[in-house]
């Protein structure tokens, strides 16, 4: 892969770390801010909703700016937002800082996806997207477990200061390696051309399958710390090593999903979403058995991130050249709306007394909705192709 794609991977690592790090710090944050664990979990939902709002707004506002300039501005927002998190004197400040940080997220991955696919041959586009998203998997593999350990040893604020330093490093790498001209297009795209993508049914279906397909993961992953400690029975010190196992699964799934999508996008979409639903059902069955739970958490990581490149490429293809940046950013927002939906659904499940053990079952049901939407979308493709192939009467 070109060095510029690897630079985008570095930025993705920083953003991925700040998104997911709170999941390993929920108990510490809840205790320090004097709120319940479900209320602390809303910090995840707040971040996700900030991505959902910020992605389309910033994408449209920056559509005429050079792509590299946009990427650097977003990394600056990210870095300042994490510093604000570390300084938060109360829950409300922390929530506001998380939302500020989140504004950079969707547009960075949206613009980054367009830049990454512009740097490689057409048959390597999904792999280029997957390479950039390796930053997210490494963030989960190393950043989140490190954050959980760092928070346990030095406090959750120190973990956010560490992420701030990561942001500075990522800014420098993107500035040094990403070309100034890549991804800018031959001519500026008008606002009407960009927004017109929202009228395409396949784009909207693609966004919906991303929301529901990914929400299932976050029903479980948002509450992974209390699940492992309070239900499965692991000591708190075991959470970081288990998150390393999950992160290893994400890394495997991310690469596998890119390769599968390059070989056949439709099969990759259906196969990965179906696998994710099946693994979640399996996790529900073995959650009380420690060794089996660890094995299923590894498989959960593989299945979850195998969906990323197929879902992102599906929306890019449906959008076409004129709407690809907005559609790409909106799909990142859709991932995070799924994050918020999953965190909310998990919190409701807990608050209604169904218990932590019910979370994987709820998650599997939500993911199944994403699978049904994918099947519907592909059926529409076949119908449209058949109509186009019929000669006019």
Regions of interest found by a model, annotated:
Residues 53-92:
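Conserved MFS/SLC helix-loop-helix module at the cytosolic interface between two early adjacent transmembrane helices
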Residues 267-311:
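C-terminal transmembrane helical hairpin of 12-TM major facilitator-type secondary transporters
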Residues 34, 66, 87-93, 233, ...:
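Helix-breaking motifs and short loop linkers at transmembrane-helix boundaries and internal kinks
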Residues 97-135:
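Cytoplasmic helix-loop-helix junction between adjacent transmembrane helices
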Residues 6, 77, 81-84, 92-101, ...:
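Paired small-residue
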Residues 55-66, 253-265, 351:
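Helix-to-loop junctions at the C-terminal end of transmembrane segments
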Residues 91-93, 121-127, 131-176, 227:
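Helix-loop-helix hairpin linking two adjacent transmembrane segments in secondary transporters
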Residues 108-120, 306-320:
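Intracellular juxtamembrane helix-capping segments at the cytosolic ends
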């Amino acid at each position: 892969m070109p060095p510029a794609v690897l630079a985008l991977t570095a930025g993705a690592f920083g953003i991925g770390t700040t998104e997911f790090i709170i999941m390993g710090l929920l108990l510490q944050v809840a205790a320090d801010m004097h709120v319940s664990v479900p209320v602390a979990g809303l910090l995840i939902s707040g971040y996700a909703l900030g991505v959902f709002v910020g992605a389309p707004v910033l994408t449209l506002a920056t559509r005429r700016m050079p792509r590299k300039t946009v990427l650097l501005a977003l990394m600056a927002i990210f870095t300042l937002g994490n510093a604000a998190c570390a300084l938060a004197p109360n829950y409300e400040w922390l929530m506001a800082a998380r939302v500020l940080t989140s504004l950079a997220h969707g547009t960075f991955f949206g613009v980054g996806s367009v830049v990454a696919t512009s740097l490689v041959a057409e048959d390597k586009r999904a792999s280029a997207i997957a390479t950039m998203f390796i930053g997210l998997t490494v963030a989960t593999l190393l950043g989140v477990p490190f954050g959980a350990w760092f928070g346990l040893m030095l406090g959750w604020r120190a973990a956010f200061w560490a992420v701030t330093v990561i942001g500075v490093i990522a800014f420098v790498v993107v500035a040094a390696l990403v070309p100034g001209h890549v991804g800018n297009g031959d001519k500026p795209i008008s606002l009407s051309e960009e927004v017109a993508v929202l009228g395409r049914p396949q784009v909207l279906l693609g966004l919906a399958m991303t929301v529901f397909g990914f929400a299932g993961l976050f029903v479980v992953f948002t509450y992974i710390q209390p699940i492992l400690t309070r239900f499965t029975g692991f000591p708190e010190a075991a959470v970081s090593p288990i998150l390393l196992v999950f992160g290893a699964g994400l890394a495997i799934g991310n690469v596998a999903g890119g390769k599968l999508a390059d070989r056949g996008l439709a099969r990759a979409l259906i196969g990965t979403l179906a696998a994710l639903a099946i693994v979640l059902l399996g996790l529900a069955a073995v959650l009380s058995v420690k060794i089996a739970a660890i094995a299923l958490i590894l498989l959960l990581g593989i299945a979850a991130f195998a969906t990323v490149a197929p879902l992102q490429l599906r929306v890019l293809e449906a959008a076409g050249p004129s709407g690809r940046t907005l559609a790409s950013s909106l799909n990142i927002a859709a991932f995070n709306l799924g994050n918020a939906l999953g965190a909310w659904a998990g919190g409701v499940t807990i608050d209604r007394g169904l218990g932590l053990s019910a979370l994987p079952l709820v998650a599997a049901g939500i993911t199944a909705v994403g699978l049904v939407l994918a099947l519907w979308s592909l059926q529409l493709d076949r119908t449209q192709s058949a109509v186009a192939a019929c000669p006019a009467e």
